[in-house]
A protein has these predicted regions:
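...captures the hydrophobic TM-helix bundle architecture rather than a specific catalytic motif
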Residues: 1-157
């Protein structure tokens, strides 16, 4: 006589709620996380752009100190390039590339998830530099040093 044992693997179903987004290995979910992060950074960078434009509305200081203005200008450029544009491309790539090549998922899906979760932490550290002693970098969004600070090493004759 044989006994039939039922499987009780109810806890192995698809994740729901917040754990779906925290621990996902699905390329579409990770792509969606990148796209939402990109949108949030676009809003933060856009708010900085509005402060920058309001400061430039008239000559003189209206809203922020000159040093804070330069810091905000630098972080605005960093956020828009490395926080909005590049994560949007990565999010679209996470969504589309596996479907285009016929793969079920990205290679190394857990590392794909980890690479996303490093991003909010890094941008949190970068944004917190605005409010730390010493402040954020303040050399403009192009990262060019002013021409008045150029240094020419002594020439060898």
């Amino acid at each position: 006589m044989s006994a039939v044992v039922e499987s009780h693997d109810h806890h192995h179903g698809p994740a729901k709620g917040i754990s779906r987004w925290l621990f996902t290995t699905n390329h579409k979910d990770i792509g969606t996380l990148y796209l939402w992060f990109s949108f949030a950074m676009f809003l933060i960078g856009g708010a900085m752009a509005m402060v920058i434009r309001a400061e430039l509305f008239q000559p003189g200081m209206q809203i922020v100190e000159p040093e804070f203005y330069n810091q905000m200008l630098t972080l605005h450029g960093l956020i828009m390039v490395f926080g909005a544009v590049m994560p949007a491309f990565v999010g679209l790539a996470n969504w589309l590339v596996p479907m285009m090549v016929g793969a079920p998922d990205m290679a190394l899906p857990r590392m794909n998830n980890l690479s996303f979760w490093i991003l909010p932490f890094a941008f949190g550290v970068m944004l917190s530099s605005l409010f730390m002693e010493g402040g954020a970098p303040n050399f403009g969004w192009t990262f060019y040093a002013p021409l008045s600070t150029t240094y020419a090493p002594p020439s060898v004759t």
